[in-house]
Every structure is written in structure tokens, then in C-alpha cells.
């Protein structure tokens, strides 16, 4: 059986997790979240692996999404950070590669400033998870594993 790949993407300022506004985002660092997800995923199934990428640059995020089209990525979990609210280019990249994706936000963006209520990605995502803290990443990965098991062979 071929190993499936889930690509975890994190956008701007998420490299500051653990120290940036911990009253909103918590005290877990991005490295600890990635490590925890890798451990959790291996407990769920040996046939799915997690790849991680974080950048503060919109173009780099788009380039990585394009790369996913040819590197065997089967599903994407993305916390686009502030790109959520204005990046049509990110939306176009995600829809252009035809890889299912889950949008994740640590905080409940709907309880925050008005400008955070609009997402350019939500209507194209398979699922949107927000307000569950870092557990949202785990829920997204678990959803992807279920999706990949149920996905018909091409």
C-alpha cells in the first residue's frame, strides 16, 4: 500500500505560536504542534505521513501548494492566518491544484474583529475548523485520514 501524504501549511505569524498573544492562541509552539500531530497520526495509521511547511510569505505558500500537485500530496490542512481574509491568490492556488483541503483557525474568528469574519477559502474547503484551539489541527488531520481511507481509487 502506498503511503498517503497530508501537507500541513501554516501562514504568517504562526511561527510565533507559544509567545504571540497566548490568551488567544495558547502556549503551544508550532514545533510542538507539528510533533504532536506526527505522533498522533502514527497512532492512527502507518499508511499516512505528515509534511509541514510554515511561511510568512504569500508567494512561498502558493509555491508550496503548487509543489503539492506533483509531490504526491493527498490532502492539505491549512491555517492561512491573515491570508484567509484577503488572498484571492491563495484561493486560486488551492482550487487550482485540485487537492482536498481543510481550513483551520486556532481562535474562533467569528468572535473577533469584523475583518476576520470573511474567508476567501471557506467555500472551497472540504471542512472549516475554528475556535477549538490547537485541537483543531488534530481534528483536521483525523478528518483527512478518514477521507483518504474512503476516497475511491483513481
Curated annotation (Swiss-Prot):
Taxonomy, superkingdom: Eukaryota
Active site: 25, 105
Pathway named in the protein's UniProt entry: Aromatic compound metabolism; 3,4-dihydroxybenzoate biosynthesis; 3,4-dihydroxybenzoate from 3-dehydroquinate: step 1/2
EC number(s) recorded for this UniProt protein: 4.2.1.10
GO molecular function: 3-dehydroquinate dehydratase activity
Keywords, ordered alphabetically: Lyase, Quinate metabolism
Entry-linked Pfam families: DHquinase_II
Keyword Nucleotide-binding: no
GO biological process: 3,4-dihydroxybenzoate biosynthetic process; quinate catabolic process
Keyword Chloroplast attributed: no
SUPFAM superfamilies hit by this protein: Type II 3-dehydroquinate dehydratase
Job description of the protein: Is involved in the catabolism of quinate. Allows the utilization of quinate as carbon source via the beta-ketoadipate pathway.
Subunit structure: Homododecamer. Adopts a ring-like structure, composed of an arrangement of two hexameric rings stacked on top of one another.
Similarity-based family: Belongs to the type-II 3-dehydroquinase family.
Protein name: Catabolic 3-dehydroquinase
Organism listed in the record: Botryotinia fuckeliana (strain B05.10)
Amino acid at each position: 500500500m502506498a503511503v498517503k501524504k497530508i501537507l500541513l501549511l501554516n501562514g504568517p505569524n504562526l511561527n510565533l505560536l507559544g509567545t504571540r498573544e497566548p490568551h488567544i492562541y495558547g502556549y503551544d509552539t508550532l514545533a510542538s504542534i507539528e510533533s504532536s500531530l506526527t505522533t498522533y497520526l502514527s497512532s492512527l495509521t502507518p499508511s499516512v505521513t505528515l509534511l509541514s511547511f510554515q511561511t510568512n510569505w504569500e508567494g512561498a505558500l502558493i509555491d508550496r501548494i503548487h509543489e503539492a500537485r506533483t509531490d504526491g500530496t493527498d490532502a492539505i490542512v491549512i491555517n492561512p492566518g491573515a491570508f484567509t481574509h484577503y488572498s484571492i491568490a491563495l484561493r486560486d492556488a488551492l482550487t487550482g491544484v485540485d487537492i482536498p483541503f481543510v481550513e483551520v483557525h486556532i481562535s474562533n474568528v467569528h468572535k473577533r474583529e469584523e475583518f476576520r469574519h470573511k474567508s476567501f477559502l471557506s467555500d472551497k474547503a472540504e471542512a472549516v475548523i475554528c475556535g477549538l484551539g490547537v485541537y483543531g489541527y488534530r481534528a483536521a488531520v483525523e478528518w483527512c485520514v478518514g477521507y483518504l481511507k474512503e476516497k475511491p481509487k483513481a
